[in-house]
Amino acid sequence: MSSGHIVQIIGAVIDVEFPRDSVPSVYDALLLEGGETTLEVQQQLGDGIVRTIAMGSTEGLKRGLKAENTGKPISVPVGTQTLGRIMDVLGRPIDEQGDIGEEERWAIHRKAPGYADQAASADLLETGIKVIDLICPFAKGGKVGLFGGAGVGKTVNMMELINNIAKEHSGLSVFAGVGERTREGNDFYYEMKESNVLDKVAMVYGQMNEPPGNRLRVALTGLTMAEKFRDEGRDVLLFVDNIYRYTLAGTEVSALLGRMPSAVGYQPTLAEEMGQLQERITSTKTGSITSIQAVYVPADDLTDPSPATTFSHLDATVVLSRDIASKGIYPAIDPLDSTSRQLDPLVIGEQHYNVARGVQNVLQRYKELKDIIAILGMDELSEDDKLIVSRARKIERFLSQPFHVAEVFTGSPGKYVSLKETIASFEGILNGDYDDMPEQAFYMCGGIEEAIEKAKAMKEKEGK
């Protein structure tokens, strides 16, 4: 293949000059002398010069260094050999367990499946988390976004979903850590190891200490591995933490490439980059990819271009609220803001739909009454409104739930609640079956039986 030499280095962006008759194509991978650093061609500037992004540190590089054109895009290992392993953006093992020993490598830039090949599914994916199963049910083979500001529990919710779904789900999982904390990646690895499901998970990390090129491409590396499993006819779970960091890496790269920024300083190609990634995360007639993505919301502003661009690609959106977290209700999922395309009586059935809408109606009415309560107090409300407030406060508390992954912090064992039990419990609260129970009994419990036990214990305590 042709070779060129470095003519300019600006941070993570490197210009390489090639003979004019053998200029590399856009997205071709270039190998630098010494073989440690890979570059990816982003632009052809003319006169045989290409502008590239470094997939790794640019420390110690200098002008004149030779670069070899591989003639093809970055390719990564795919197939069952990747399971139980931690890899970087180039598919190199970083877990000190020796070579991957892959039989096949796929390019990370691929076309999305054609419209005729795609397949939709109406099957529900039970998560064991009450508020999600009731208000924003997940579809098997669908895309889910966990939206939240800093510190409201995106990663903990993601870990609980992995714990509940990946362990119950007999299929394979791919976890892409995009620009998140290395500590969380480490915790995830040992969590999977302890649960004996490590041999079903492939992990790809490009964490926040890495250059923007790595963070921009690591999501594609993870997705390529998931696509291979899907095309073999398997059902795959793809976890991405965090999609916002993918956008942010794109912003950094875009600025380094000299593009004019658009709204709020984001790259002008924001919608296109997001589309290229999201359109590939889809289920086909051969197999399915169910994707769960954490989305950081800058300054808790859901209208920010990055989360706003992500919204349109998702089947279900789980919105985490700082107000709910400040009340000590975890998971801090907002039942009035979270939505799902599956919340349709034709998909989930009349009973589930009516209970979910009933819960939302009661909570919405309580939200409207809060101003009156703040000014005039509870006594000024009608009897009907007092009943609504009482039930809403019980529902609010009953939407909380102890998590398995938080056991080490809270000391209380995690609870998995089946969908059937969730629907029956909330239907009982709406029908007034538990009006005589104190609202404290509903806080941090699994099923309704546990709340009844708590209420009994409280009564006995008062009796003494």
UniProtKB/Swiss-Prot annotation:
It is found in: Cell inner membrane. It is a peripheral membrane protein. Pfam families: ATP-synt_ab, ATP-synt_ab_N, ATP-synt_VA_C. PROSITE patterns: ATPASE_ALPHA_BETA. The keyword Secreted does not apply. Signal peptide: none annotated. It is an enzyme of class 7 (translocase). InterPro entries: AAA+_ATPase (IPR003593), ATP-synt_VA_C (IPR055190), ATP_synth_F1_bsu (IPR005722), ATPase_a/bsu_AS (IPR020003), ATPase_alpha/beta_chains (IPR050053), ATPase_F1/V1/A1_a/bsu_N (IPR004100), ATPase_F1/V1/A1_a/bsu_N_sf (IPR036121), ATPase_F1/V1/A1_a/bsu_nucl-bd (IPR000194). It comes from the Bacteria. Keywords: ATP synthesis, ATP-binding, Cell inner membrane, Cell membrane, CF(1), Hydrogen ion transport, Ion transport, Membrane, Nucleotide-binding, Translocase, Transport. Its main location: membrane. Transmembrane segments: none annotated. It catalyses: ATP + H2O + 4 H(+)(in) = ADP + phosphate + 5 H(+)(out). GO terms for cellular component: plasma membrane; proton-transporting ATP synthase complex. ATP binds at residues 148-155. GO terms for molecular function: ATP binding; ATP hydrolysis activity; proton-transporting ATP synthase activity, rotational mechanism. Its EC number is 7.1.2.2. Belongs to the ATPase alpha/beta chains family. Produces ATP from ADP in the presence of a proton gradient across the membrane. The catalytic sites are hosted primarily by the beta subunits. F-type ATPases have 2 components, CF(1) - the catalytic core - and CF(0) - the membrane proton channel. CF(1) has five subunits: alpha(3), beta(3), gamma(1), delta(1), epsilon(1). CF(0) has three main subunits: a(1), b(2) and c(9-12). The alpha and beta chains form an alternating ring which encloses part of the gamma chain. CF(1) is attached to CF(0) by a central stalk formed by the gamma and epsilon chains, while a peripheral stalk is formed by the delta and b chains. This is ATP synthase subunit beta. The lineage of its organism: Bacteria, Pseudomonadati, Pseudomonadota, Gammaproteobacteria, Pseudomonadales. The gene is atpD.
